[in-house]
Amino acid sequence: MASLVECGVRMGGNAFSPVLLAKGELTPEEAAGAKPFSGPDGAALKASLKALGYAPEDWETLVAVDAAGAPLAPDLMRLAVATLDPATLICCDETATQVVRDAYAEELSGLEDLNEALLPAGMVAYVCGMRFLNLGGFAAALGDPRQKQVMWARLKQVPPLAEPY
């Protein structure tokens, strides 16, 4: 973990948790160094995961961009995901999704369903033993009641794999 931090990877929460929340579109506060997911998006995601049956300690976070806002290199993103070892990777925005697409391009290209391989918003893909879900703009959806319902429907596709909390 320390070597990832030395490489500029920002992460938080409990390592080896079943859910990894990745984001690449940071708030101004997060870009200035605030804890990722410390705003309304983090509160809403945590409440949603709890409602699905995840225990409060069952998620961790990963920022898909470096301090300058550039996407993490594919090998670094892949190393971070492998180190954190989630069962489910939830990409909260298109930036994070693109970094994941780049990091897992070979595995995604091997999927039988081309649509699934593109990681479109709302579709769950199974890659390297993990469930990948692209929420497609979670933070932006919080201001629109209809879009919040869409996000909730998407999150319901990835319930806990074990007994609910």
Feature-to-residue mapping (PLM):
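A polyanion-binding, active-site-adjacent surface
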Residues: M1-Y165
